[in-house]
Amino acid sequence: MAWILLIIAGLLEVGWAIGLKYSEGFSRFWPSVGTVAAMIMSLWLLGSAAKTLPIGTAYSIWVGIGSVGTVALGIALLGEEVNAMRLISVALIVVGIISLKLATPA
């Protein structure tokens, strides 16, 4: 169950990171409300997952999911640049996430 909570927390991190862009520095009300709500839920779920998972693993995977998802949505929704270095970097993050999962009992 902790892994499921962690994945949801990571996806919510992607949501609030993209929400930061749409809130335009918290100057737009509804995108700001959604961003703050996603932040709170993401951190709460991370904390819940960290009750049973090692904090180093939980935090690293949370950040990794957030990073990979934010890069992907930045490309897909915001027209951010796609280049070989970005794709290789994201692939390395994914390898790190998988390695941490495999190295963590639970």
Name every feature range the model reports, one short phrase each.
Residues 1-106:
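Polytopic alpha-helical membrane proteins, predominantly small-molecule transporters/carriers
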